[in-house]
Structures are given as structure tokens and as C-alpha cells.
Amino acid sequence: MTSTSPAASTDPTEDPPRVPASRVAPAASGLAARADRLTKVYGTGDTRVVALDAISVDLPRGQFTAVMGPSGSGKSTLMHCLAGLDDATDGSVYIGDVDITTLDDKRLTRMRRDSVGFVFQAFNLLPTLTAIENITLPMDIAGRKPDQAWLDTVIDTIALRDRLAHRPTELSGGQQQRVACARALASRPEIVFADEPTGNLDSRSGAEVLGFLQRSVREMGQTVVMVTHDPGAASYADRVVFLGDGRIVDEMVEPTADAVLERMKRFDAAGHPSEG
């Protein structure tokens, strides 16, 4: 699915078009990230909560993975631990070949800066900077010059070249989130984590952002992991990982919105996974 036209939709009853196979970039070999028996526990005694229960998952390079599950299933905690934003209680997390659970704070900060891109529900753009200044800000802070050819590719893919001199208040919500996506990709990170990236957008703007994330994977060879509650958004991914009670309970390859919606219905009223 390459279109970011106004007709695109994240309606769970409507499957988005797919990028033609001839336009899909070959997947890079190896893993962008992985977790090995990752466990996260909050509290002690009567207040002890196991948010992640010995999860093992591989995230191949050049793949778009969506993470889904009911509220409290551990999906955001999983993303935060994979991205090095939260510490694991037990187990290991790798970005590339580096076990980030062994890094001190300084090296972990450097790893996140150099190897990880983030897209959040809030756009987090600086209002006094232009779109292009927001896109290059992380590299400017790190004292790194952008790869101009790659930056041009990213800018052309978000289709906002004519808006680069505009400040966030002069952009629509969808345009601001596309700028945030470009900022995450500008440094060519090992992996991009997106936490409900369309949560503040209408269906048209959300489809534009999801289309951009999908093209960044299929045409540019990036790796994206997205947490979402929306079956329509998940259908843009190559693979969906379903969480329940802090464990991976199912996976789906080449998902459709309808298939994802049906799987989500199999969680019971309390949010626990069901085999029914």
C-alpha cells in the first residue's frame, strides 16, 4: 500500500491496498532486535504485577511488526523494554548484536540516540523550529551531519517538501506526525518504535502516516515495531504479535483488518486470551 490519498482509511472493515511485490525492498538479513525470556515485574508482595512473563520474540530487519492486545496485556511495556526506555527485571534485550540490558546509562543513551527511532502518539515537535529543523534536530544535538541522499529520500516519501519551512502550527495533525516519523527515520536507525502513532489523528491522516511507515519498510528497508489497538492500523504491518497477560499468545502474518479484529474478539471480557 503506497497511497496516502484522502481515500485511504483505517476502518477495520476496509483492507488497505498493498505495495506491489515488485516494489518491496528485499529484507535485510538478521535481526534488528530480539528479546530472550524478557520479564518485567512492578512492585513487591501484594502489589507485585508481572507485566511481561518471560517473553521471547525476534524482530527481523526490514519487517513491519504490529503489537496488539487488550489494555494491561503488556504491549507498551514490551515496546519500552525493547527500546531501552524501561529496565528489564530479568532476561535479555538485543538491538542488533548488543545486549542493552548490560549497558550503563551513558552507553544506553548513546545506543538509543544512534540506533533507535521513536514515534509517539503526541507529535513532540518544537513549535519554534521549522519542519526540516525538527527533522534534523536529534542529529544536530548529536553533532552529526545527515546523509543528504537518505534525508532527501525520507522527505520525498513523506511528501512534505513544500512544507519544510513551515512551523508545526502551520501544519495539520497528519502533517505534524509525518514530520515526527521523518525525524525518527532521518538518522537511519536500526529500528523504529511507534507507540499508537495514529491515536490523535482522524482516519484520513492516520492512513497517510501508516502508509508512510509501511513504505519506509517495504521501499526503504527500515524496521518498524508499532503498538496499536486498531485492527485497521495493524493491517498495514507484515506481522502482528498478540499479547495477553504479559505473554505472546498468537501471531499473524500478512494480516487483514477483519482477521485481526476476529482474533481480538477472542480475548474474554477481563482481557485474558481465549482459545475459543
List where the protein language model places each region.
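Conserved ABC ATPase signature
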Residues: 167-177
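Conserved catalytic motifs of ABC-family nucleotide-binding domains
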Residues: 188
